[in-house]
Design a protein with these regions (language model features):
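Short, surface-exposed binding/anchoring microloops in extracellular/periplasmic proteins
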Residues: 78-115
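N-terminal prepro-regions of secreted/extracellular proteins
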Residues: 1-90
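Short, surface-exposed beta-strand/strand-loop-strand elements in extracellular ectodomains
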Residues: 113-126
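Exposed aromatic-hydrophobic patches
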Residues: 142-150
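Noncatalytic modules at the cell exterior or secretory-pathway interfaces
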Residues: 101-103, 149-166
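Edge beta-strands of jelly-roll/beta-sandwich modules across compartments, strongly enriched
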Residues: 113-115, 157, 165-180
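Solvent-exposed serine/threonine-rich low-complexity stretches and specific carbohydrate-binding patches
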Residues: 128-141
Length: 181
């Protein structure tokens, strides 16, 4: 009986290992194919748009209280915005007479590394997202810039500031250049 246990236990272990490897062969094969570039599947493209770093200074004129939870002021064809401890906010509507707006902003946060801005067009009964207008700004305190073009000069738009968490707050400022009213 002792000799039988010595033979049976290693055989059972080998069978268990072979069964486990057999059930994993498709997964292992897919991993190897991906690593060697022979995969049949197409990887989803990352379409995240990041605002580009800029060394240009950011001046937010017309803001009475820069420590306000949220404040905005339209000055010299610019919409200047500060936010302190928000989850999300949206601006009032404005137009883009030249069909393009340039956004410069910065941010800091308690536990997230980015926040996002997106443009919405005013339509009957509400607002419609402007395709391709979402940009992410890192919350490292540095200034970042992006431009959104192809806008209808006769349409009204608003900007949404938000991030993908309700656990933490974001702090920062934005300057939206190229606006009217």
């Amino acid at each position: 009986m002792k000799n039988a246990k010595r033979v049976i236990i290693p055989v059972v272990i080998v069978l268990v290992v072979l069964l486990a490897l057999n059930s994993c062969k498709d997964t292992l094969g897919a991993v190897i194919d991906q690593a060697t570039g022979k995969a049949d599947t197409v990887q989803e493209e990352d379409t995240t748009q990041w605002a580009e770093p800029t060394s240009d200074p950011l001046s937010l004129e017309g803001i009475g209280d820069p420590s306000a939870k949220y404040a905005a002021a339209a000055v010299n064809s610019c919409l200047n915005i500060v936010f302190n401890g928000i989850w999300s906010r949206q601006t009032d509507y404005f137009t883009a007479p030249n069909g393009v707006i340039t956004i410069t902003g910065y941010g800091t946060a308690e536990g997230t590394q980015k926040y996002k801005i997106a443009l919405w067009r005013k339509v009957d009964g509400g607002a419609q997202y402007v395709d391709g207008s979402t940009y992410y700004i890192k919350t490292d305190g540095q200034n970042y810039r992006c431009s959104i073009g192809g806008l209808d000069p006769a349409a009204s738009y608003r900007l949404t500031i938000s991030y993908d968490s309700s656990r933490y707050y974001i702090y920062g400022g934005l300057k939206v250049e190229g606006i009217a009213g």
